[in-house]
Amino acid sequence: LDPSHLIWQGMDPIQVIRALGGDAIFHVHAKDTKIDPINAPIDGTLDYRPYGDEIHRSWIFRSIGYGHDELFWKDFVSQLRLVGYDYVLSIEHEDSLMSKNEGLVKACDVLKRAITFEDKMTKARWM
């Protein structure tokens, strides 16, 4: 599951996770996409421009937190856990606006706050 591709296609990764369910998700990429608010409404998101022409593209891949905010990523990992996926998130860096090292550090910063690391509570105390 790669949310960055779902985003540029106009899909909602949170809803896709719920629709697929945990049985259909075997690996998850942690990569973001920023839809350009000036170019996308004019050109759509099926962009034909070279990836290096960022200023004219309708979207570009971004590091985690630079296309969508931290709340989105908290919702993303929570939905994965809700459907039963509790495994690897592979950070994939294709952000042309920052170095690989900086992109990795910034992605890790956001994901550390978004991911829950302890076992989930399986039964509510009132049940």
Predicted regions and their residues:
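Acidic/histidine-rich catalytic cores of soluble enzymes
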Residues: L1-Y66, T122-W126
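Conserved, mostly hydrophobic/aromatic
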Residues: D2, V28, L80, L89, ...
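A general structural motif
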Residues: G22-I25, L82-V88
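A conserved mid-domain beta-alpha-beta active-site/ligand-binding segment of alpha/beta enzyme cores
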Residues: F72
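A structural motif corresponding to the C-terminal end of an alpha-helix
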Residues: D75-D86, F117-E118
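A short, acidic, flexible beta-alpha connecting loop/helix-capping segment that sits on the rim
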Residues: S90-K100
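Short, flexible loop/turn segments with low-complexity composition
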Residues: E92-H93, D119-M127
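C-terminal helical cap(s) of enzyme catalytic domains, especially alpha/beta-barrels
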Residues: K100-K120
